[in-house]
Regions:
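Short functional hotspots at interaction and active-site rims
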Residues: 1-183
């Protein structure tokens, strides 16, 4: 991965790691507390719908979009358009080998940009090299820990608010990069 990073630096490209994840209505149970003899209980219903989120992590910022259902090639192209519009500079997008990332629709979109967005793939089975994975860990194990929404709309709204709070906290973004041991 060092070669794409060096080339990006030479060409003045901004490096953006991209990844997708799902957030379930089912709570991520972490540490709980209750007085001795009283078992802590998290009440939830058994209709475990989910919200999908796609995020791009730069050295200083996190850009994201939430979707109901799975993220498909169309949502990936929409996200790449948003990245291009928001970041302006030429980009090096680094992501995993998800089939949708290699789809014809995504390739055609990228080919039509005249090289404004270039792509590099992470090695197979190397999620620990992607700093966005650590953003997901923070979101699920800290920001949404033990959170039990009443419905999908509430989950969507809360996840959006938590990710917006991460955008305003540079230490969270920096910690994701440190955890991935990239800088």
């Amino acid at each position: 991965m060092a070669a794409p990073q060096k080339k990006a630096k030479r060409e003045g490209r901004q490096i953006v790691f991209v990844d997708e994840s799902g957030i379930s209505e089912r709570p991520t149970r972490v540490r709980t507390w209750a007085p001795k003899g009283q078992t802590p209980i998290i009440q939830f219903h058994f209709n475990w719908n989910h919200v999908s989120v796609i995020a791009g992590l730069t050295r200083t910022n996190c850009l994201f979009r939430l979707h109901e259902g799975s993220i498909k090639k169309e949502e990936i192209v929409d996200f790449l358009k948003a990245l291009k519009a928001h970041l302006k500079a030429p980009l090096l997008v680094i992501w995993d080998g998800l089939k949708a990332h290699r789809s014809r629709l995504v390739r055609e979109y990228l080919d039509g940009l005249g090289g404004h967005i270039q792509i590099a793939f992470l090695p197979p089975y190397a999620p620990d090299m992607n700093p966005v994975e650590y953003l997901w860990a923070w979101l699920k194990r800290h920001a949404l820990a033990n959170y039990c929404p009443n419905n999908l709309g509430e989950l969507h709204s809360t996840a959006r608010n938590k990710l917006k709070s991460a955008q305003k906290r540079p230490l969270i973004i920096a910690a994701c990069w440190v955890q991935a041991t990239l800088w």
